[in-house]
């Protein structure tokens, strides 16, 4: 493996300090309402989450950001950021994407990686100074700047985000660690379908989702007791 492939593993690792563990993205509402309460309901939730919410918002955004960065199209990147800002309906999830994006960028800065001072990554962050930087977007730009193949960037991101959802289910429902691993490995058959599908989509498909995820995200803001920030 090359050095850049290890960096790809690092930025997708659960220990990479962007605060993703603090967010359930509405899952906590599903659990408190008894909708997600065991292995079977967790499997249904995870499958729909990755096929709709994750695929058409985060994964597609990462791909579009990567391709815009490859073209050095700063205007398209800024447009993508504005679309993401406008399309995330739950307030807590907007804030989560901003915070994780900001922390991702700041952590990358501290790693002293080879990132051109005149490259699109620096130009993009400078243009977004004082504004929101979404995690999926900055991730896509970073991967292109590091010359990481698009397929690798997307597959690692999909695995990492799915693993995070499974971990939240295990901790919060709760489920056994073995059940969590079974749920995660059970998603692998969907990964290839999702990755192939997302490569054929364009900006018009961005943020296509199931409204139930947004509704539970909004309801999370008013839960009496909460373990997660979203």
Spell out what each predicted region is.
Residues 128-173:
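A contiguous pocket-lining binding segment that forms or flanks enzyme active sites
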Residues 8-17, 46-52, 86-93, 122-129, ...:
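A short glycine/serine-rich beta->alpha loop
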Residues 59-64, 71-143:
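Internal, conserved structured core segments that host functional sites
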Residues 4-72:
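Glycine/small-residue-rich interface belts in oligomeric ring/scaffold proteins
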Residues 30-40, 111-118, 145-153, 172-179:
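Inter-helical turn/loop segments and adjacent helix faces that build the functional surface
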Residues 44-57, 87-88, 127-133, 161-170, ...:
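Short, mixed-charge aromatic SLiMs
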Residues 160-230:
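C-terminal auxiliary extensions adjacent to catalytic cores
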